[in-house]
Amino acid sequence: MSFVNSHSSRLNPILFNLLKSLVYFSFSGSVVAAESHYDTLIINARQGDISTATSWFDGQSRNRVLTAAEVTDWLQINGWAGKDAEVRRIWEAYSPTMSLPDPALRAAAKSYRNLRQWQPSVALWSRVLQRSPRDDDARSGLILTLADAGQTKTALELAESRVKREPTANHWRELAWVQRIAGKHTDSLFSIIQAMRYAPQDKALRYDYSDILSSNNVSAPALNALENGKLHGVQTDERQRQRELEAAAELVRLAFIASTTENERFVVADRALARYSALMNQWRTHPSAKASYRHARIDRLGALLVRYRMEEVISEYQSLLKEGDIPSYARRWVASAYLYLQQPEQAEQILSAVIQEDPSQRLQIARQGDFFYSILESEKVEQATQLSVQAGEKTPYKKSVYGLSTFIPNDDWVDIKYLRIQSLISHNDFPAAQRLAERLAFTGPGNQELNIRLAEVYLSRGWPRRAETLLKRVELLEPRSFRLETHQGLTALELQEWRQLEQLTDDTVTRYPDDFSVKRLARLRQVHHMAELRIAGAQGLKSDSPTKGMNDTEIDAVLYSPPFADHWRVFSGGSFNQSDFSDGQATHRTLRGGVEFTDRDHWAEAELSHRNFGLGSDIGGRLSYRHDVNDFWRVGLNAERLMRSTPLQALKNGVTANGAGGYVRWRQSERRSWQADLSHGWFSDGNRRQEYALSGQERVFSSPSLVIDFTPSLSVGANSQQNTPYYNPRKYVAVLPALAIDHLLYRHYQTEWHQEITAGAGRYWQKDASAGAITQLGYGQRVRWNDVLDTGVSVQWDKRPYDGKREQNVSLSFDLNYRF
């Protein structure tokens, strides 16, 4: 053996061990370095450097097969970054061939939930719980995912059972979340309060508390909770603005609730307007707050409506409409504003559009009345009636309230009955309206509003004393009710209780100046205080009767002063009559003046006149008086020197007459009345004239726009002398059954346009002359405007016998009553 060889064989084991050690330490160092780099990637990822880690994993996955731990970290890091689609891709790539730990399953389950893929998310949470039944995070994920998936029943069962076992802050919080999703907002509020009891300093809980308060419409505390729960460095501008809007909207809702005291009824609305003003000033210049600014403008409409700033509501609505759609609740406010401003067509158009978009709102809108009145005041009476009937059929008399074992009376049912009463009145069916109103009032004697509605019906039927008695009786329930005082004021106007009218109107106008019914009362009082002009005239077009002559002209005008000292008015006027008779033309001129007195149950006029006629002139006078015994009976008396009904042909021939008369009227209601008249005239030529008449009115037919009355009349007269220079039948009897038709052509609140038709056919008997038929036909039109103008024009054709010969008379007449 050589040295070399022998030496070499001795060195080989030493070299081998040395080389082995060098290789080991070199490999260990590289492993340690690799592990250190990996840990740094994970730590940096947790601190926000996501892209470096994900890039490394992506590169490594192309070069080699990743380990289960690496896949898990890759899933979790992408989950931290919110890259749910990437998490899903990685999971679906590795899970079929690799057994991954629970953190990987949790990361994938969260991403599936975020991607709204409920079924795989629920399956993954369930797998985690199968492996680790006590994994609380996985149970939370399962509960919340089930709730998001709409499986609220199962989610509630799991959350409730867990909170019973372990009532922690987080468990109560998650139960509140599930209850909120399930629509159990009250329960969710209770649960979040329990959570805060366990962790009162947890600001994140206050965030959830704010959200749940908001979902329960407890807006102001929700805003406070958000303020108290703000986390450092967390941007909450959008959520803050939302809470600010909700708190202001809550004030608007409260503003619509009637306040317990008059002085406070606008306090809440004013607070809402002030709050909106501050918010809008703050958000106006911020582009990010553009949507919130518009939302504030929309909700502000409700506060403006409560404050009766109707023009502003309309103006702001039109401005908002140019910028986009407006939610239905705000459009309903706008409809109310249009209705208040007496623009019912606009209100109906808006509400019809709201109902068309959401038919489920129809019944609710109908119950509130605006839709009904917008249709009714647009003169679509049948449609309004149908609406009230349909709403009544769907509104029960009693309703159930959560938490009560018994049913309670339904206020909506009463409101619908009010609408039904109004529809019956609009149909001119006052008896049915009275029966319904009495049934409501008599079954609720302690309800002042029901009795006020009944009094309103009584007043509409011409029974002010009956209405007064009823209103006085219910005054004890709420003496200062402005609705009560308003109707008492209207009743006082009908009863000529002028001082009472003044006091009630002053009080209601001071307290509720913007209420529509109060403004109506104030308007009627204003009209009462105006001067009044009355003009009436007639022109014969074709006549050959001995009473009218030919080409006859009549005109009479009188001007009344405004009332003074409550009861008094002075008046002055004149008249002109002229006609052609067989013995020449006759002319009669009158100037007159006097005083009028009105008081409760009494009316009187005293007049002095200067009359120029025939062969000279003379001084005349008149006293007229009437007394209302009650709502049904009235008696009247009058006495005249140079009575106005003296035939014009008699005056032409120097024959004058004095007269006296009276009448008794019985008026049951607007549907029936009868009157008996008598008059006696003493002529200067010795003739004595006596006349008696009985006339009546019986309602035959009524509808919203058409009224037909049967108006029979019976006249009897006698004169003591014959062969006078004027028509003077010795005795006569006239019977004339007739119909009077009143057709409403147009109506818009206090503006009305009617056409009137009269037709009659009867018989006339005259002593010492043959009997003959009476035929009568008339057509006219009448306009009433704004409570101050009432004027009409008509054409009449009449044909009847005079001394046995039938003569005709065609004339055109007009009348005007104007207050200014």
Regions found by a protein language model. Name each.
Residues 1-35, 285:
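Gram-negative bacterial Sec-dependent N-terminal signal peptides
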Residues 40, 69, 73-79, 84, ...:
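Gram-negative and organellar
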